[in-house]
């Protein structure tokens, strides 16, 4: 008997992926590795089941929890691979190369102080990948588009032994920078202006520049450093929030201690007032009882009978018998 083929489920839609990323952004303190220190497994499992319910609410076919976790793992792997390509290109001093998903590969022209070469299309992240990158805490670089040109200004070669000829690189004056999301830096450039005239050579006394570093690599390094600084600032802000929460807890404890001390002080005041009232009542009672005690003593003294005097004994005979008997 032939085994029936297993029906393959449809791929995750954009809406499902958006829900997964949105829920993970809301529950990052439970599910993201560098946020969920000390979170119990039961809380993590409940959070994943909540994400699964939201995904199944919009999905065309029923999803299982391992499928959702596998999709999130694939999204993280793809974003980390692109960021690794950018870092490798920055460390190697070359522009980031194209990827299979970008579809932006193509030849270009570029120039550097060390020689001539071909510029490769930069690695670009989609807005969803940028959100995932920020969620993972990776330093993101969005390189300049391939249409941006760098205009070198050739200076005169006449110089003395103490002077060095400096090649100036013109950056478009209308370049602006803005932040898409926290930790993501994007470069937006307008049309490149025409190159400066090269008629008048300029001589400057300076140290010979490092010709091995390309301008594009310098820009990429600056962007990487800025992204790292932003990430460090985010971590610092988290520490500051934790310290603030700790201080708030301590303030709450201090307020509770103060309230208990106030309650104890009120109780002591009430006890002191009660003691004073008792003492006043006793003093009044003593003052009332004193005349009564005096009157009672007088009464006892007046009503007590005086004892009768003892009778004188009769004459006793010499032999010890009374005289009446003798007579």
From Swiss-Prot:
Keyword Transmembrane: no
Coiled coil, from the record: none
GO biological process: negative regulation of cell growth; regulation of mitochondrial membrane permeability involved in apoptotic process
Main location: nucleus
Ranges of biased composition (kind: Gly residues): 104-117
Region: Required for nuclear localization and apoptosis-inducing activity, residue numbers: 1-70
Subunit and interaction comment: Interacts with HARBI1.
Similarity-based family: Belongs to the NAIF1 family.
Function in brief: Induces apoptosis.
Protein's name according to its UniProt entry: Nuclear apoptosis-inducing factor 1
Species of the source: Mus musculus (Mouse)
Lineage: Eukaryota, Metazoa, Chordata, Craniata, Vertebrata
